[in-house]
C-alpha cells in the first residue's frame, strides 16, 4: 500500500504566521516598499546587522552581496565591505530615512544556523530588492500597528434580524394551517426593536422605520447555542470548507454506496484544495503535513466582490 507523501510545514511557521496576521505587513515610502512575511532563511546568509529602533535592539541577517548591491548608488564604485565600519553604518542609516530613530550599531560577517522559519523583511524599490531575517519577531510585533482593513479579504458576513421568540409544542407546529394566528409575546409590537445576529451570535438591536433600519444599541444577551454575547467581531466564528474534489454521481451510484466502494475524484494526488467560506470561493492551496496532521498552504486568493 503506497502512502501519500505531502510537503512538510512546521508548527513554528504556523504559530509565527498566526502572530503576524494581527499586524500590518505592507508599508510604503517615497522610493519603495517594505513587506513582512514568514520564510525559512537560506543556510548561506553571511552578514549580520545590529540595529536599534524605538529603544529596542534587533538582530538581522542578510546576504552581504545583496546589501552591497542595495547601496550601489551611494558607493560610487567602492566595494562596500572595504569601507571603514563607521562609514558602512552611516550609509546604512542614510538608506533607512523611512524609519525615523533607527540606529545601526554594528555590521559584521556571520552565518545563521537556524532551521526554522523566521520573520522576513523585504525591501523593494525600482528593480532592486533585499531580504532580511529577524531573530526576535516578538520584539518587533510590540512596535507594529494593527493590521488594517485594506490588508483583509473583504468577505461579507450575513446579518439576520430576529423578532421575539415564540415557543410552540410539536403538535402546535404540526397543526398550523393557512390563516392561523399566533399571539406575539407580551410587550412586543410593531415598534419593538429586533435583535440582529451576526452568524449565529446575538450582536445588536435595530429599530425598523419604514424600509430602513436604525442601529440603537449593542446586545449583551446570549442564547442557548452561544452562551457568551459577541463583543469582538474579530472573534466571529466562520465555518470554512476545504475541498479536495467535487464530483457529480448518478442516482444509482449514490444509492448503491457501501463500505469498500470507490469514487474517482478525478483530482491529482498533489491537486489543489479549494477554500470556501460563507458560500464564496476564497482561494486555492495545497495539502501539507504539520506534525502528523493535515494542513493547507494557501497559494493564491480569489478576488472577493460584495454585491
UniProtKB/Swiss-Prot annotation:
<dbReference type="InterPro" id="IPR013385">
    <property type="entry name" value="T3SS_SpaO/YscQ/SpaO"/>
</dbReference>
<keyword id="KW-0843">Virulence</keyword>
<dbReference type="InterPro" id="IPR001543">
    <property type="entry name" value="FliN-like_C"/>
</dbReference>
<keyword id="KW-0614">Plasmid</keyword>
<dbReference type="Pfam" id="PF01052">
    <property type="entry name" value="FliMN_C"/>
</dbReference>
<dbReference type="GO" id="GO:0030254">
    <property type="term" value="P:protein secretion by the type III secretion system"/>
</dbReference>
<dbReference type="GO" id="GO:0050918">
    <property type="term" value="P:positive chemotaxis"/>
</dbReference>
<keyword id="KW-0653">Protein transport</keyword>
<dbReference type="GO" id="GO:0071978">
    <property type="term" value="P:bacterial-type flagellum-dependent swarming motility"/>
</dbReference>
<protein>
    <recommendedName>
        <fullName>Yop proteins translocation protein Q</fullName>
    </recommendedName>
</protein>
<comment type="similarity">
    <text>Belongs to the FliN/MopA/SpaO family.</text>
</comment>
<dbReference type="InterPro" id="IPR036429">
    <property type="entry name" value="SpoA-like_sf"/>
</dbReference>
<comment type="function">
    <text>Component of the Yop secretion machinery.</text>
</comment>
<keyword id="KW-0813">Transport</keyword>
<dbReference type="InterPro" id="IPR003283">
    <property type="entry name" value="T3SS_OMP_SpaO"/>
</dbReference>
